[in-house]
């Protein structure tokens, strides 16, 4: 097999770009996508497969936190007998930059600050177990559709925002009073309601997230940013607009 070409999207920021080394010689762009797609929306995969040298790649995500999750989750990952080296490029990351994807300006976003992409298609979830993280919640709610934001609070409640209104409606109808399992194995039956003036989260700050404090013990950390559903079949990399739920 031969290496894939360069499939470029709009220029991004260095915080979103990661280096992937120690790749097998027959690696393809699609193979790299298969390794990293679950961490978030991928903007660009640049595979370098030069004669006389081992291949390496740069993967650029839409959101810097997705890139960070990918580094934590895939550095040292065994891929067909090759232990991947995944890190931020040596040229350096930016030091906390403003949010992207939703306009410029404003205060710089902290390392674990809220994402820039938000939606009004919001549900409130209650009854979460103490170890439930926003990644767990996002995984659970993806059964209903494309999730663009998820967060949890210390009181066992959380919010989830969907890209489409019909997915929000489906979540309330199908996921209310369903069994939720955290990454630590705790289970609970959760309630799912449309957000509104009477809900616990209405008008509440999203800054009290437990999202990162527990996530580093998980090899498959998830991001709060939008991750489109994925369908397999294309031999080349392209941004996905449909994706099945995965807990692998």
From Swiss-Prot:
One of its GO terms (biological process) is cardiac muscle contraction. Residues 88-134, 191-248 are annotated as: Disordered. The keyword Repressor does not apply. The modification N-acetylserine is found at residue 2. SUPFAM superfamilies: RNA-binding domain, RBD (SSF54928). Changing residue 40 to V: In NEDFBA; likely pathogenic. There is a cross-link at residues 30, 38 (Glycyl lysine isopeptide (Lys-Gly) (interchain with G-Cter in SUMO2)). GO terms for cellular component: catalytic step 2 spliceosome; cytoplasm; nuclear envelope; nuclear speck; nucleoplasm; nucleus. Changing residue 160 to M: In NEDFBA; likely pathogenic. The modification N6-acetyllysine is found at residues 38, 179. The modification Phosphoserine is found at residues 2, 133, 199, 201, 205, 207, 209, 231, 234, 238. GO terms for molecular function: DNA topoisomerase binding; mRNA binding; protein kinase B binding; RNA binding; RS domain binding. Residues 198-247 are annotated as: Interaction with SAFB1. Signal peptide: none annotated. Residues 205-248 have a biased composition (Basic residues). Changing residue 97 to A: Predominantly localizes to cytoplasm and fails to modulate splicing of endogenous pre-mRNAs. It is found in: Cytoplasm; Nucleus speckle. Changing residue 162 to A: In AV; loss of ability to activate splicing. Great reduction in splice site switching activity and no effect on RNA-binding. It holds the Pfam family RRM_1. The modification Asymmetric dimethylarginine is found at residues 93, 97, 109. It is linked to Neurodevelopmental disorder with dysmorphic facies and behavioral abnormalities: An autosomal dominant disorder characterized by developmental delay, intellectual disability, speech delay, hypotonia, behavioral abnormalities, and non-specific dysmorphic facial features. Some patients have variable skeletal and cardiac anomalies. The RRM 2 domain plays an important role in governing both the binding mode and the phosphorylation mechanism of the RS domain by SRPK1. RS domain and RRM 2 are uniquely positioned to initiate a highly directional (C-terminus to N-terminus) phosphorylation reaction in which the RS domain slides through an extended electronegative channel separating the docking groove of SRPK1 and the active site. RRM 2 binds toward the periphery of the active site and guides the directional phosphorylation mechanism. Both the RS domain and an RRM domain are required for nucleocytoplasmic shuttling. Belongs to the splicing factor SR family. This is Serine/arginine-rich splicing factor 1. The gene is SRSF1.
């Amino acid at each position: 097999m031969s290496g894939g070409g360069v499939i470029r999207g709009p220029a991004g920021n260095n915080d979103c770009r990661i280096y992937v080394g120690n790749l097998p010689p027959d690696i393809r762009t699609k193979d790299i996508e298969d390794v990293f797609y679950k961490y978030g929306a991928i903007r660009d995969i640049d595979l370098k497969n030069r004669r006389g040298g081992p291949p390496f790649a740069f993967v650029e995500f839409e959101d810097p936190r997705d890139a960070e999750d990918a580094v934590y989750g895939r550095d040292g990952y065994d891929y067909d007998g090759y232990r991947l080296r995944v890190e931020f490029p040596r040229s350096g990351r930016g030091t906390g930059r403003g949010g992207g994807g939703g306009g410029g300006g404003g205060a710089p976003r902290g390392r674990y600050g809220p994402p820039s992409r938000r939606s009004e298609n919001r549900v409130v979830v209650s009854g979460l177990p103490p170890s439930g993280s926003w990644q767990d919640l996002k995984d659970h709610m993806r059964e209903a559709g494309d999730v663009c934001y998820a967060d949890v609070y210390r009181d066992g409640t959380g919010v989830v925002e969907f890209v489409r209104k019909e997915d929000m409606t489906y979540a309330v109808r199908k996921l209310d009073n369903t069994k939720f399992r955290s990454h630590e194995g705790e289970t609970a039956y959760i309630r799912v309601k449309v957000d509104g003036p009477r809900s616990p989260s209405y008008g509440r700050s999203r800054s009290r997230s437990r999202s990162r404090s527990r996530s580093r013990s998980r090899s498959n950390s998830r991001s709060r940013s939008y991750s489109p559903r994925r369908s397999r079949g294309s031999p080349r990399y392209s941004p996905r607009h449909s994706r099945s739920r995965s807990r692998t």
